[in-house]
């Protein structure tokens, strides 16, 4: 038996040589796979329903990014818990570059929001690796065209006259709409009632359908309804007026320091190989500077704000520090 095993396995030196060769082939194969990346379709996970800011950004990017990568880019909506379910899916995905998150600004506060609510966070931000920021928009405060309020001052006066009687739709607890409205409410010393829906698209439909009195939305989400005369913009949450809404004042002009921007950016799972990340970053850079993408952004009224990974990481970290304070101030929601 010993002789037979010896013949099969060879000498210890031969066995070591075989094992070393196998390891080398494995390492070479992995390196080759990274060099050839991508060899199959890439999925952009949108953690919100269709029709919202993350969905619009993802669908504008998909085709030009596919052209840059020479591979199919799919857009998959995975909504739930204000975007946390989709973000967690990407955070826990295989770090091979084929599963990418199109996140909104709420991605940096969702873990803290879960803790404030007494629940375990579905993911932590260090489980995601920044690729690029694509856009950063102020929110537009909206009412229906038949609303009695024609200015932000009208709405705030009504809220002060009858505290707790004005409701608004949101994309979910601690999401961009919720945070932007509560920041203004705090500054104006008013009480507004949040009615959470499962995303920016459903939130907009709730306002149009008369289920709520007001909401806020990214310009791209609101533009068509404003143009059609169905919605009236009262104010914007940015530092300056929007080019597409030059007659609509900012919160700051009305005397309220409640600046808020909803941004959209791409993340990969932490642990994605550097070579793969570099390919993703370079291809995104090429895609977002293509005429197809820039014209699409302009048509939708989205403010293009491209930042590569290092700048995006710094931007998101600073925004997260600021917005986590807002989450803690709001506190647990019953």
Task: Go through each PLM region and give its residues.
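Beta->alpha turn/N-cap motifs
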Residues: 102-107, 170, 199-200, 217-222, ...
């Amino acid at each position: 038996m010993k002789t037979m095993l010896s013949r099969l396995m060879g000498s210890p030196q031969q066995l070591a040589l075989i094992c070393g060769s196998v390891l080398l082939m494995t390492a070479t194969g992995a390196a080759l796979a990274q060099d050839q990346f991508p060899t199959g379709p890439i999925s952009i996970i949108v953690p919100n329903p269709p029709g919202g800011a993350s969905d619009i950004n993802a669908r504008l990017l998909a085709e030009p990014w596919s052209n840059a990568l020479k591979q199919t880019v799919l857009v998959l909506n995975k909504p739930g818990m204000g975007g946390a379910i989709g973000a967690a899916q990407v955070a826990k995905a295989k770090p091979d570059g084929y599963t990418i998150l199109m996140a909104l600004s709420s991605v940096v506060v969702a873990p803290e929001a879960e803790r404030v609510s007494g629940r375990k966070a579905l993911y932590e931000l260090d489980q995601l690796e920044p690729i690029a920021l694509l856009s950063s928009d102020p929110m537009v405060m909206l009412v229906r065209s038949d609303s009695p309020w024609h200015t932000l001052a009208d709405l705030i006066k009504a809220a002060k006259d009858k505290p707790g009687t004005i409701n608004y739709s949101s994309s979910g607890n601690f999401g961009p709409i919720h945070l932007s409205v509560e920041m203004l409410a705090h500054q104006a010393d008013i009480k507004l009632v949040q009615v959470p829906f499962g995303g920016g698209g459903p939130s907009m439909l709730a306002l149009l359908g008369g289920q709520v009195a007001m909401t806020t939305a990214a310009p791209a989400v609101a533009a068509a309804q404003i143009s059609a005369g169905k919605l009236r913009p009262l104010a914007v949450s940015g530092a300056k007026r929007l080019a597409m809404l030059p007659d609509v004042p900012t919160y700051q002009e009305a005397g309220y320091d409640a600046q808020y921007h909803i941004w959209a950016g791409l993340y990969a799972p932490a642990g994605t190989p550097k070579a793969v990340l570099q390919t993703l970053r370079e291809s995104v850079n090429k895609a977002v500077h293509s005429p197809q993408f820039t014209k699409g952004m302009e048509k939708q009224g989205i403010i293009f704000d491209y930042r590569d990974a290092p700048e995006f990481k710094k931007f998101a970290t600073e925004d997260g520090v600021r917005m986590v304070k807002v989450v803690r101030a709001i506190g647990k929601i019953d």
